[in-house]
Amino acid sequence: MPSSAFLPRALALTAAALLAATAAASPAHASAPPPGEADTPLAPGAAYKAAYDTLGAQRLTPAQRRLDAAKQARAADTSATARGAGAALAGYKLSGALHQSQKTSYWCGPATLVITQSAHDGVAGRSQQDAATLLKTNTSGTAWYGVDINVPGPTGYPMADALNHRLPGAGYVPRALPYTPTATDKANFKQHITHNTDHDYAIAGNAWEVPGGPHLVGHPNIEIFHWVSIDGYNTDTAAAQVDYLDPVGGVSTSVISWAGSVPKSAHISSDTLTTIMGGRGYVW
């Protein structure tokens, strides 16, 4: 399902249009939870997501599985090192991503691509049109999975493929999340944002906000599919809070009616953000 702000189910850019645009989704939906986590209480909004998500299982390629395992091992080491250095790194540590406001109501994906890319190479002002073309973004948004873009060896994950194409050697890999992320999912995300930030990379997060569930800062209590760039973490709390850049920030209310309440940059609990991304995931 594509995921771009703002796309509430009841408006012209409907979830039905989104569902028609791609045909696959998260493997985490059907996977067994880690031992001891089978009884994790349903996250707020999880039942809604389960009821309305018609996407099937997604697949990581063998190369992506190997890369994810290798990065996970490195991330665990990075997180442990960061905890040891916490006193010296008081406050938020950022990767330095450069914000852009999305140019249309459905270009949060292209904006997130150029923002996330800028965290590593420091280049501002890249074309969102070029990013939209690369991602195969349409009026339904930018897909989480199920779209092969025009790069060598596409995997079906357009954001991951675009980032790896534009940042050779970056090793971006998608991490899918279940509707109710487990304690392990939340701990892994803390390790991943620590690892990426410490290595000068941001994370592209694919949010699925639903009525009754948690929302990003300034977002209304409606269903919204959205991409954001997660560019740092709180060293004082071992990444219990993170910093993210929201492409809706700075957008005219004539384009997105509720944009006026959305900051360009915001802090949020990492557990809350992990829950918001449940049913989709992030590219780290």
Predicted regions, residues:
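N-terminal low-complexity, Pro/Thr/Ser-rich intrinsically disordered segments
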Residues: 73-98
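Active-site nucleophile-adjacent alpha helix/oxyanion-hole segment immediately C-terminal to the catalytic cysteine
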Residues: 91-141
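Positively charged, low-complexity intrinsically disordered regions
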Residues: 10, 84, 127-130, 195-196
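Secretory targeting and sorting signals
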Residues: 1-32
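Conserved active-site-adjacent core of cysteine acyl-enzyme catalytic domains
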Residues: 31-54, 65-81, 137-284
